[in-house]
Amino acid sequence: MQADKVKVAILGSGNIGTDLMYKLLRQPGPMELALVAGIDPASEGLARARQLGIPTSASGIEAILADPEIRIVFDATSAKAHVRHARLLREHGRIAIDLTPAARGPYVVPPVNLGMHLDAPNVNLITCGGQATIPLVYAVSRVTPVRYAEMVSTVSSRSAGPGTRQNIDEFTFTTARGLEVIGGAHQAKAIIILNPANPPILMRNTIYVLPEGEFDETAVQNSVAQMVADVQQYVPGYRLKNRPVIERRATPWGERPVLIMLLEVEGAGDFLPRYAGNLDIMTSAARRVGEVFAQHILKEVAA
């Protein structure tokens, strides 16, 4: 291992793992991709890794545990598999960055709370909808208390694989919980829509935020703009369609000002198509989390 690099591995050679591989090669930062491990020796992801000269294995997590120099593991398998992986990785002193819905560790959104969990052995990236919308709800709640937040995420049917389709309930529950726990909303709701349009649409999100009362509109607008800029540092295709709109509406809590934000996420096109911004924001967030963890490890070694 290079002195200024931390060895990392990707567990899972499907679309998510493969896109993450390309991101780590394009922007390695303080990370050295030492292994891509899967369980299907004929998978396209492992074949692509071999073509790029990256060590591969079809032995799954056992191959990762066999290399004591691997410090960080990106788990892009399934929630069921990660339950087992989380235990084994913890026992072997490895850091797990979980891209599945398993949530065996704390929820993490890079520009919001990553710095609070740098000593955690396992962190979870929630959902694509959570990574997209939690930063904006948090941008409001850090200025004024938020009574209620609601997000509607519309993604292309082509970007929603069998895992997404089988876990719709988990998606809505986990995303809503993230809007509350990290976003700062007292109560939240999440909705996902799969759009079969062709050509495929980009990921689009509508976020409604209901503050507790009157608030400083300029301060909120500035906070949202800063948060968008923060996310764009690792997801360049993350953008608001227009400035947040503030309308007075009748709500279950009486007439209140409601903040409405329209967000679009375009992927980088590393491996997944650009319309799959919902998947790209997960792999982009994972790369960013890995980068910060690696920096933290190197600082501890140097201390």
Swiss-Prot record:
GO terms for molecular function: acetaldehyde dehydrogenase (acetylating) activity; NAD binding. Signal peptide: none annotated. The active site is at residue 128. NAD(+) binds at residues 13-16, 159-167, 278. SUPFAM superfamilies: Glyceraldehyde-3-phosphate dehydrogenase-like, C-terminal domain, NAD(P)-binding Rossmann-fold domains. One of its GO terms (biological process) is catabolic process. Keywords: Aromatic hydrocarbons catabolism, NAD, Oxidoreductase. The keyword NAD applies. The keyword NAD applies. Its EC number is 1.2.1.10. It catalyses: acetaldehyde + NAD(+) + CoA = acetyl-CoA + NADH + H(+). CDD domains: ALDH_C (cd23933). Pfam families: AcetDehyd-dimer (PF09290), Semialdhyde_dh (PF01118). Belongs to the acetaldehyde dehydrogenase family. This is Acetaldehyde dehydrogenase. The lineage of its organism: Bacteria, Bacillati, Chloroflexota, Chloroflexia, Chloroflexales.
